[in-house]
UniProtKB/Swiss-Prot annotation:
This is FAD assembly factor SdhE. It comes from the Bacteria. Coiled coil: none annotated. Belongs to the SdhE FAD assembly factor family. The lineage of its organism: Bacteria, Pseudomonadati, Pseudomonadota, Betaproteobacteria, Burkholderiales. It comes from Ralstonia nicotianae (strain ATCC BAA-1114 / GMI1000) (Ralstonia solanacearum). The keyword Oxidoreductase does not apply. The gene is sdhE. It is found in: Cytoplasm. One of its GO terms (biological process) is succinate metabolic process. SUPFAM superfamilies: YgfY-like. Pfam families: Sdh5.
């Protein structure tokens, strides 16, 4: 039997990765949860691996910082000021 290298699976081809991403998306603030849940309901099946990487970066933020970005009170800065994060953030803001 051959070992399968799961690191080569994309987000779309691996349901476990999708489940982990949804689990990481759970937030402490209801407002963030609502926005993120709507986002997943609309875009989950269309997410690229770059989108998943950007979401992962956003989900590492404290809840209040994420809410400020989602509500456009602030714009991404530093390591978050990259096209992939800005793209995902625009999708999150649109839902």
């Amino acid at each position: 039997m051959t070992a399968v290298n799961t690191s080569t699976f994309s987000h779309q081809s691996d349901p476990h990765r999708r489940a982990r991403l949804r689990w990481r998306a759970r937030r402490g603030l209801l407002e963030n949860d609502i926005i993120v849940e709507r986002f997943f309901n609309r875009y989950e099946t269309e997410l690229s691996d770059d989108d998943v990487g950007a979401l992962t970066q956003l989900f590492e933020l404290p809840d209040n910082d994420l809410m400020d970005l989602l509500l456009a009170r602030k714009e991404p800065e530093g390591a978050l000021d990259v096209p992939s994060v800005r793209h995902v953030l625009s999708l999150l803001r649109a839902v």
